[in-house]
Amino acid sequence: MKTMFALLFAISASAANLDPFFAVLGKVESSNNSKAVNKKETALGIYQIRPAYFKDSRVKGNHEQVFNPAFARSVCEAYFKRYEPAAFASGDFETLARCHNGGCGWRKNKSATDSYWKKIKKNL
């Protein structure tokens, strides 16, 4: 039991605190509006998650569930763990922001995410 507790403590102690990042992400994406809809992009919820992003996250459920902020965060976290695991683990807000905005291939055209990163950084 002590070993299990020590392991759980070590894991939680080493995990990055992403709360500030998600607070800013919600502010930048939707002004913290969990019911936000971008009809042009079919982006939904507080983090403006598109259908392809949702599908790539591999989270069970359906795209409309991202109106629930906790569910939306779990989608983003799964997406980040899949495409930027080191950044997720270390709390690299810049990489996570660029990935969220530019998709999993954002590194091919990093400059396309520059203005988005500036918005996030300004609000941190």
Residue ranges and their predicted role:
Residues 18-33, 49, 76, 96-104:
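Short, functionally critical alpha-helical segments immediately adjacent to catalytic or ligand/cofactor-binding
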Residues 16-18, 40, 89-93:
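Extracellular/periplasmic catalytic domains that process cell-envelope and extracellular macromolecules
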Residues 33-37, 56-58:
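Short, solvent-exposed loop/turn elements at domain surfaces
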Residues 37-47, 51:
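Extracytoplasmic strand-loop-helix segments at the start of, or within, the mature domains
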